[in-house]
Amino acid sequence: VKKCNPQDEIEAFACPVAFTVDVIGGKWKSLILFHLMSGTKRFNEVRRLIPDITQRMLTLQLRELEVDGIIHREIYREVPPKVEYSLTELGSSLAPLVSAMREWGAVHERKILELRRSAVPVSSVASCSSI
């Protein structure tokens, strides 16, 4: 396992953490993975479980996860067409990581939200030009 060196730019992903974030990072991918951990889902099921995601964004995120081998898309030749998504073996290997993220969020959510509420808004911080 390579050590994470923030100044190492020799390889695109010199740090395994950066690579993992590239695969499952962003606002939606970890939520998609979390919901697929409980079993196979159709597109609209995932959409209902993550109501703030747009149809276009869900399509893009599912496609990226499929390209990376994290999820499997099964297309059934039916009318109307039926498509189901499930975790691959590689995707299932992320379950402990996603579960750890869930646990961390459950433990620390309240404290972080309190800190955010008490933070000084960025727009009210003095800058050199406002003095």
Model-assigned labels for residue ranges:
Residues 1-12, 67, 72, 89-131:
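C-terminal regulatory/oligomerization modules of transcriptional regulators
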Residues 8-57, 77-78, 84, 115:
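N-terminal helix-turn-helix DNA-binding core of bacterial DNA-binding proteins
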